[in-house]
């Protein structure tokens, strides 16, 4: 008896799964029921001569550092090395509307009833339903089945806005900074909160890249994970840097960012002493970085993500460059990233090609 064909999953031909890695991707076996019909973009970090083994049956393309250098040329300098921030190269070369990115130490979680959670499906539902950043709904996501807008919610805002980002959570190993890891080495996250909420306009959040989905067409050019890792004075701030940038831009352009479901199972705790070395400067710098982003505003001329990001890069150079020369280098890399994005995506815009030569140079 012939087996029935597998049902086509949501957005099968409109979504890429991006995975940064330095090891064989055996973890994909657990995700096979949910990922097998999607296209994978694997960004190999570290030694490009190492062969990364991918389980049979997956449709994928794999890029190592040699590929990144070949494709981007001198602009490859904006892509981090020996850091999971390299994943953003996968965002750049994707041709799909949506991206889901996951770390290779993350596995399928189970809900309180024992059922395996299809994290990707929940992310897609989050992205395809509107967000409510301008007025908080006390029943959280009003578009989920079994809920609605509460009494007193303005009818003029009930249509919502497009969702740009879906930020998922994790069970087991929490995403803590090194000092918290050191004082709570045995703590595990066992709380499953069945909720999705929109992060209000004007509020920042610490974005984690291990279980993250976004609309690439809406916010992709701003989803840059910065300069981290090899040769840089800081690490483990890549996803948070991107999160602060995209939140300022989403607030300006009128897009929404959701957090909550879905959960994944985070299996491996990283070394807190290694993490402390990576985070040390960032722990101090963030006390100035956060107020910078809280106060950041973009001009009315910023009508595209690229324009927003270029303007934000100039503010980074001007206001954070006084903290450390690293931020001047980072601001330049932000411009390089946008230029590379537009070149790769055949969308070379006038504002990105002219800015580096004139406006940004004038701020040096």
Curated annotation (Swiss-Prot):
A motif (DXD motif) lies at residues 103-105. One of its GO terms (biological process) is plant-type cell wall organization or biogenesis. It is an enzyme of class 5 (isomerase). Glycans are attached at residue 151. Keywords: Cell junction, Cell wall, Cell wall biogenesis/degradation, Cellulose biosynthesis, Glycoprotein, Golgi apparatus, Isomerase, Secreted. The record marks 151, 158 as: Required for activity. Its cofactor is Mn(2+); Mg(2+). Reversibly glycosylated by UDP-glucose, UDP-xylose and UDP-galactose, but not UDP-mannose. GO terms for cellular component: cytosol; extracellular region; Golgi apparatus; plasmodesma. Homopentamer or homohexamer. This is Probable UDP-arabinopyranose mutase 1. It comes from Pisum sativum.
